[in-house]
UniProtKB/Swiss-Prot annotation:
Nucleotide-binding listed as a keyword: yes
Binding residues for Zn(2+): 144, 147, 183, 186
Catalytic reaction annotation: thymidine + ATP = dTMP + ADP + H(+)
Active site: 87
Protein name: Thymidine kinase
Taxonomy of the source species: Eukaryota, Fungi, Fungi incertae sedis, Microsporidia, Unikaryonidae
Gene Ontology terms: cellular component: cytosol
Organism: Encephalitozoon cuniculi (strain GB-M1) (Microsporidian parasite)
GO MF terms held by the record: ATP binding; metal ion binding; thymidine kinase activity
InterPro entries reported for this sequence: P-loop_NTPase, Thymidine_kinase
UniProt keyword list: ATP-binding, DNA synthesis, Kinase, Metal-binding, Nucleotide-binding, Transferase, Zinc
An individual GO BP term: DNA biosynthetic process
Positions contributing to substrate binding: 119
Pfam families found in the cross-reference section: TK
Amino acid sequence: MTRGTLNFVTSPMNAGKTANMLLRARHAATLGRRVLLAKPLSDTRHESSVIRSRCGIEMKCDLCAGPEFSFTKDVLYGDVDILLVDEAQFLSSRQIDELREVADVHGIPVWCYGLLTDFKKNLFEGSKRLVELCDKMIELDIVCYFCKADGRFHLKYANGKAVVEGPSIDISIPGDGKFVAVCHMCWTEKTSTSEEVQDPRVLCAKVIPVDR
């Protein structure tokens, strides 16, 4: 049996994680591999039947995983060659354990894409468990909105001011409307002053054109 792997691709918002995942899915499909695309039910930015990147690439979502969903009990993997999971930071530790089991027992590659930390610099539950269990972790680069250094952290703003309070999971409006990627020095500076953030816009990674 082919040995499966659990892989974690992570970056701050707008570095191209979902686009990267969908490009991987399309490439796998062109090679005749049977692809299963999944995302958490808590990702309500788009309809549950679609996974869509900010650059416009989209594909059909095969399953949405709610809190009680089991990747080991609720899915038959006989016709699956590769499993790709978007927004994996929203999964529970148990579900990440199950994805590890899927890779080991069924011998298929599992690719999880998601944020590493929230805007308070705390690991998400799913991301923490992925770091502990994954075979390979890949970080996509994005630059700091303010100084153009590596932007590994998130700055959340409300009414033009940086904030460090509130729930870690906040999808009331699209994430690129309230978060920017920043370096640690800029995160510290902006959260320790009352300076207003003018026209906050995230700098996106370079997008590769794809025929739709």
